[in-house]
Amino acid sequence: MPPRLPGRYMALPAGALLACLAWAAPASAAQGQPPADTAPSAVKRGAPTPAGPRLGTSSTQAPSGLDPDPAFTAYQRGRYRTALDLAVSRANAQGDAVSMVLAAELLSQGYGVRQDPTAARQWYEAAAAKGNPDALFTLGAILMASASTANKDQAVDFFRRAAEGGSARAAYNLGLVYLQGEVAPKEPAIAAEWFKRGAESDQPDALYALATLYRDGNGVPQDAVESARLLQRASEVGNDVATTELAIVVFNGTGVPKDEERAAALFRKAALQGNAIAQNRYARILSAGRGAPKDVIAAAAWHLAAKAQKLDDPMLDKLVASLTPEQRAQAQARVKPWAPAPAY
């Protein structure tokens, strides 16, 4: 799964064009990109047919009503060229929108073929014309990254249509549009409604965004209990930013019973996910022995992990400086430069 960008925005789904990174949501494609390859001889890459573009890739969800879908199964097994053949065949023969999206994903990422953003976009547009929410969302993300005001206005329309079609990622991004007030009028109450729609589908970033609105009383009545509940759910579905904030809430007893041990466990959970703030706070907990047994070497290791992500803490710098050379070496040995967290 591609890394999710922490904070207000989400990373585009696995096949989305790279220029739109700030406005999209995570998908479940594999992290490693296979080597680009030429298309099978049966498929002429980029050549349109009367039914639409000639190439396509698989969606990360199997088409409804097909159990199992051969193209999706091949995609999941890493047989990308086979998935492409099957998706293209079905898209051209039956006008199947899900197969079109799969084709677009493969072309956009270069799975099984050389990357072809133009052909990928053609497939997204063909699927969007059929009302496919994933295609509408991706096109919205592409347009939102444009400098053109007209394109951004169209992006809002695509997000809306995708959200109304059931895309939780689109609902989240539409909420951002109304929360920020840069593309559409700033309307926190409307933003909250779209975040709620995304949260109903357990979209992690929508849950977190809605929690912050309840925390601040922005567009909704201020409600620390509801904010904590939403943070808890966002944490459960993998949002490390929400887990970090939930840990702070639990440590302070805001909207939930104060529980330093639970807070320490939550900080550790987010720290292991690579969240620099959680790494810093967990280091402080270990250095003070509040909520977890005092462990200055572990505290130093977590501090160094956070510091590697440009999060400084003079107090913990002093802790590291106070260690013996042997202790510092032990702490440093637990932090590998390519790892998001100390190796325990």
PLM-predicted stretches and their roles:
Residues A62-P63, D67, Y75, R79, ...:
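Short helix-capping/linker turns of helical repeat alpha-solenoids
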Residues G78-T82, R114-W123, A147-F158, P185-W194, ...:
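Structural signature of tandem alpha-helical TPR/SEL1-like repeats
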Residues A27-Q94, V98-V101, E105, Y344:
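N-terminal leader/linker segments that initiate helical-solenoid repeat arrays
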Residues D67-A74, L86, R90, L102-Q109, ...:
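Hydrophobic face of amphipathic alpha-helices that form TPR/SEL1-like repeat modules
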Residues D85-V88, E125, R160, K196, ...:
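Alpha-solenoid helical repeat scaffolds
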Residues A51-L55, P293-K294, K307-Y344:
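Terminal, low-structured helical/coil segments at or just beyond the last alpha-helical repeat
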